[in-house]
Amino acid sequence: MNDIAVAVRGLKKVFPVPFHRQSIVAVRDLDLDVGAGEVYGLLGPNGSGKSTTLKIILGLVSPTRGKTEIFGRNSNLVESREKVGFLPENPYFYKYLTGEETLRFFGKLCGLRGSPLQKRIAELLDLVGLTNAQHRRLGTYSKGMLQRIGLAQALINDPRLVVLDEPTAGVDPAGSHEIRNLIVDLKRRGITVLLSSHLLAQAQEICDRVGILANGVLVREGRLEQLIAIENQTELVLENASPELVRKIETLAQASNAKLIAQRKSTTTLERLFLDATRNDKR
């Protein structure tokens, strides 16, 4: 099995502006890898190139230059996308269908029939917590419920890779938490998740690695614990320690009955890293 789920090499996308001599560079010389089985967050402000990058990976937009691969296959090939699920930022739903009918419709598009399809529908409705709402029309669903049925729709073909473009956009905190738990569950099942998000605290909770885009450029990329670590600072967590002991740190701790619970790198937050990264990039 290929250990790299998604590979992006030298990716550039330029959009011409009609009736103008200018053009918009949406993505600039982008290189990144998404490991199989990990949750990778592509972060950035509006217009940074996140959605364009995802659409190129999915074969929905052609790159100006560069290439993308899904599990070692060129993503332009239809076969490379047979085991890929996608939830766009603003998915379109047939509001007159019920939740069950929606999954049945997309399941048939993916070639499922009979009892395997019915079993898959039941599994997914249970996974996203919509079993009790399966016979309701989508027109009666809340935004959070629509996102969950959209995620179930993206999973109908039992994908190895799921691409989520702003999966919690417009969802209230409770619904956002449910989506977060579903993404964690996908990771537990060994499914690779590539997502874009503007909810940095949530991304910090669920992503193994992140890449931060600004003006189409990857300005930060790596594992979260490394990115948010503050160099030359260490936190000591002590039990039963007096304020004096805290000030004197380890030497006095060893001479006392205080117990050193943990020692770790001090960290910033993903939100602070994001703001610093995007503020400093002037391209």
Kindly give the residue locations of the regions a language model identified.
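Generic structural hydrophobic/aromatic packing signal, biased to beta-strands
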Residues: 1, 19-21, 236, 243
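ABC transporter nucleotide-binding domains
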Residues: 3-6, 13-195, 200-214, 219-220
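Short, charged/small-residue-rich alpha-helical element at the C-terminal edge
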Residues: 224-283
